[in-house]
Amino acid sequence: MKKTKTILFAVLLCILMCFTACQSKMVESTQHATDRVFTNKYMDSVKGITSTDYEGYWMPEKILWFEMSGKDQGYRGIIYIDEAEVQRLMNDYDDWWLDTSALPSMKDVNLSSVQGSDWYCSNEFVKEFSTMLQIKDLRFNGKDAIIFDVHTF
């Protein structure tokens, strides 16, 4: 009888643990889906603006990845671009960057540390782009990404 109770207790404990694990996965999956919807919404906005729309201003022709993160006061966005885009950007638009050779890849950077740095992009394109998406501090890191902050939707 005691052995049966022990086995029954173990089975119930196992079921409870499985249920908890499944519930945790469901919450995680839902959160990821919410983030993806948000990201896709802004990715569509970015894709909708091309270099032909703003003649003379730079816009990536090929975007590798787009990320948004943050809440409350604002969001940090990163547009990852391929090597050809980086070369085109550095060759054609010197005013986008100063000395970024010492900067690591954005994948290794603490994003809070880049705000207010000396590689702020200040050309006319920023003003146009910022107005449309309420973006501040659009910057190029000189390696693989463009970083921007979005405030107050």
Question: What positions do the PLM features span?
Answer:
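Mature extracytoplasmic domains of secretory-pathway proteins
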Residues: 45-119
